Every structure is written in C-alpha cells, then in structure tokens.
C-alpha cells in the first residue's frame, strides 16, 4: 500500500509525500530493492548523489539481475564525490556483459562516451540502443539529451 502510494507521489512529482509514504513502511521491509528503488528517485531528485550511490550499490548487491539498479548506480556514480564519467562508463561496460540486449545500458554508454569525447564509440552505442529498443522514441529523447550534445555539435 505505502509502496504504491510512494510510486504515485513520485509520478506526480511530489517527492516529499513519496518519502513520507516510504517512512510508513515497516523497518524490516525498507531495505527491499523495490523500496530502495523508489528511495533512489527521491534522493536523485534532491541531488543527493553519494546517498544514491549507497542505495544503488545495495540494490545491485541484492538484485544483480535488475538492469535499472546498474543504470541508476552508474548515474549516481557519475555525479557522486570521487565518481565521474570514466567510473560510470566502466560500471556500465560490466553491466553490458551481463545484459547485452539492454538498450538502456547502450544508451547511457553513448552518453558517457560523448561526454568523454569518444564520439565514434558514442555513435556506436547509440545505434545499438536504437536496434535494441524503440528507435523512434530513443531518437526523440537523444535529440534533447545534453549528454549527447557533443554528437550533435559535429564533434
């Protein structure tokens, strides 16, 4: 009940109410990956990247088969103290071996490579994400993604 309510509040953009709902969950369930996943959305909204990294590290450890855990961990690692694009890319390269058919990982690798100035690799990862996902939708998202701007600027 509280988990669904928290997800609803997040969908509506009310992160404080979402957090209030998560606090109502019994203590023994608060470390469940589903709860932690929602907690990540709240903390990422508030740009608490070190805490986000702790959360996603726990998710990946408990549920290594969750692609979103790996992607969110890379996003957190990119922004956390001592993180950065290189570390986030390295993590996603590891995840890509586990999930070779996941377009979200390929897309994020494209973003990190673009930011690192590795434009040929970025283009390859982006095309791979088109092949694995909804190419039309991904292209629309990619055109507005600041991380991919180096590709559109002619690199």
What residue ranges belong to the model's regions?
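Alpha-helical segment of the N-proximal tetratricopeptide repeat
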Residues: 1-34, 38-45
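Alpha-solenoid helical repeat scaffolds
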Residues: 3-4, 34-38, 68-72, 104-108, ...
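A structural motif in tetratricopeptide-repeat
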Residues: 29, 63, 99, 133-136
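Alpha-helical adaptor scaffolds
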Residues: 37-49, 54-104
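TPR/TPR-like (Sel1-like) alpha-helical repeat modules
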Residues: 114-115, 119-137
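Terminal, low-structured helical/coil segments at or just beyond the last alpha-helical repeat
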Residues: 136-155
């Amino acid at each position: 009940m509280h988990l669904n309510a928290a997800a609803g509040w997040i969908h509506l953009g009310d992160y404080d109410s979402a957090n209030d709902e998560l606090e109502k969950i019994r203590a023994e369930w608060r470390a469940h990956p589903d709860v932690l996943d929602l907690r990540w959305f709240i903390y990422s909204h508030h740009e608490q990247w070190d805490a986000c990294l702790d959360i996603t590290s726990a998710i990946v450890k408990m549920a290594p088969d969750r692609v979103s855990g790996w992607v969110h961990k890379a996003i957190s690692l990119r922004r956390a103290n001592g993180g950065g694009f290189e570390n986030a890319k390295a993590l996603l390269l590891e995840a890509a071996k586990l999930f070779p058919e996941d377009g979200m990982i390929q897309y994020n690798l494209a973003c990190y490579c673009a930011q690192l100035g590795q434009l040929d690799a970025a283009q390859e990862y982006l095309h791979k994400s088109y092949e694995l996902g909804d190419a039309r939708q991904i292209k629309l998202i990619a055109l507005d993604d600041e991380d991919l701007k180096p590709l559109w600027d002619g690199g």
